[in-house]
Amino acid sequence: MAKELFLEIGTEEIPAGFLPKAMADMEGLIRKELESARIGFGEVKTMATPRRLALVVKNVSAQQTDAEITTMGPAKKVAFNDDGTTTKAGEGFARGQGVDASALSIIATEKGEYVAVTKKEIGVATAGLLAEILPRLINNIPFKKSMRWGDQEVRFARPMHWIVALFDGTVIPFAFGNVQSGSMSRGHRFMANTSFPVRDFGHYLEECERHFVIPDPAKRKEIISREIERVAKAAGGNVLPDEGLLEQVTYLVEYPSAVHGTFSAEFLAVPKEVLITSMREHQRYFSLVDDKGKLLPGFITINNTLTEDPSVVVKGNEMVLRARLSDARFFFEEDKKVPLEKRVEALKSVLYQAKLGTSYEKMERFRTLAEGLAEQLQPPLKAKVFQAATLCKADLVTGMVGEFPEVQGIMGREYALLQGVDAEVARAIAEHYLPNQAGGELPASDTGAFVSIADKVDTICGCFSVGLIPSGSADPYALRRAALGIINIILAKGYNLPLIPLVTKAIGQLEGRLTRKKEEVLADVLDFFKGRFINLLTDRFPADVVEAVVAVSFDNLVEATAKIEALAQFKKRDDFEPLAVAFKRVCNIVKEQVTVPVDDKLFQDAAEGTLFQSFKSASSMVEEKVVQREYLAALTQIASLKGAVDDFFDKVMVMAEDEGVRNNRLALLQEIKSLFRDIADFGKLTA
């Protein structure tokens, strides 16, 4: 009979950022544990608030399923004599398994025949297994940081106060540290700080709401969304959409309520990004805008309690925000007194990275790269690119960015505009940080794009040059994001920009700082880009198609992407599979480079001449289509060789006894192979 499993872990306040991952980890762990224990189960749901993590599993089997367990023993020749009697080794294995030697069976493996014992294991009651599974699950939930409390040896994100563990309404007894499992949960810390009994999951939800706790984050998020829209409308404005803040606030409260506050309109003279950042990052406030998107002097904050007099809460929030915005206004007014170009020199005293020099030195390096990109792709922009690259890090030494690091680049743009800098240059100052998150906004201007690419390439090459290479989940310099940003900019803009010369130039500028060989750095950086490119493209195209193209064509990302698109289309056609088979036949024979040219005077069979003429005809067409980036048309031309290739293999013995004839035939096949490889390595494609 199926039953319900319910677990709640009650704690001190866990950081909001820990909770979504903890929920996902709990679900994965319980699924793995139940499957490993041969316990059937149905739907799994996890929930979290700052003070509790919970999960419910529906339709859990009351008993573990039976299983046949096979234990391998020694080799047959070790366990049995030639006459079939059991050796001491065989008898010892049987005795160790608790069976008679007659129960030994023979199993054939890749390494030979071995003896084995197969025993039926009768499933036990699930409840007893859960007493071992649940404390192990709790212990295995991974957190960025965990702690001990009191004199306990166990660790968790925050000190634990209670555990509810029920199976079919009955307590699963176990202890985690000094906390014993039971059936008693607790209400809201300030509004209902009492214990209450739990019978099952449905009862738990009812009792939580009676005690001012909404355990389900999806429901809390819905309430918050509804509340902030209601309060914003009452205040005569609209909520500035901020999904990240909404997600964060959802995990900061157990029982949300929204209140509206205001700030002096005089603060609106400060750039809106600073005001929004201050409210969002430091206070977790939602900003308000009018119907045209203009920032209003108001905010909405989410409380974790219901209050009889919200004005008291509002006044406290307004007072804190006023101090923050006063600081911002002060920094803004002071910063405006010094032109950005005069701040550039100050970058000489700002350390970028101990092994890579100052921010000024970094700026000089990527400015040269950016100029080169402009020269190559948009020569008229060279002067603007030079100016944007020179100024784009200058706001790092302003008071505003020192206080609010999140507005770097944005403040550079604002100060540049106030000081009469060209609008496109000012825009590029902000854009060079883009994209600043996965899937984020890309630079709109070419000026911003060139500086962004150059800055990121210098960062990646610099770090790789001194051994600061990402490993596992560790990527302190956000190099993966930088590489993806470069790739996305190049693809979005359609830049005809080979990577190898750009990366080579960037590494060359690091002369004197390299702690590794240039050749090693170049190879590693290109592999790094290749990995990011493959990951990005396999989200859109079949993995084998991406691998096949990247194996032969990666330097120019726009070209490689176009080839991938064409090959993905071509693979759906009826003539794809026969063509792939033909290519593999060619590759199976031409495994080493042949250095002799094709000589048609050495042909001995008409099929050789036919294939050679077909190749020459197709080759010129393929070359033309490749230059025009019409890769689907190029593939169609390559496909026209299929008949001639098949006829060649049917009628011609490639490995002829005559060395000259043999090498000539191999050279012909090598030409065919190279034609295929203008697009992709067909050998990597699956049917």
UniProtKB/Swiss-Prot annotation:
It is found in: Cytoplasm. The keyword Transmembrane does not apply. Pfam families: DALR_1, tRNA_synt_2f. It is an enzyme of class 6 (ligase). GO terms for molecular function: arginine-tRNA ligase activity; ATP binding; glycine-tRNA ligase activity. It catalyses: tRNA(Gly) + glycine + ATP = glycyl-tRNA(Gly) + AMP + diphosphate. Its EC number is 6.1.1.14. The keyword Aminoacyl-tRNA synthetase applies. One of its GO terms (biological process) is glycyl-tRNA aminoacylation. Keywords: Aminoacyl-tRNA synthetase, ATP-binding, Cytoplasm, Ligase, Nucleotide-binding, Protein biosynthesis. One of its GO terms (cellular component) is cytosol. InterPro entries: DALR_anticod-bd, Gly-tRNA-synth_bsu, Gly-tRNA-synth_heterodimer. Tetramer of two alpha and two beta subunits. PANTHER family: GLYCINE--TRNA LIGASE, CHLOROPLASTIC_MITOCHONDRIAL 2, GLYCYL-TRNA SYNTHETASE. Belongs to the class-II aminoacyl-tRNA synthetase family. NCBIfam families: glyS. This is Glycine--tRNA ligase beta subunit.
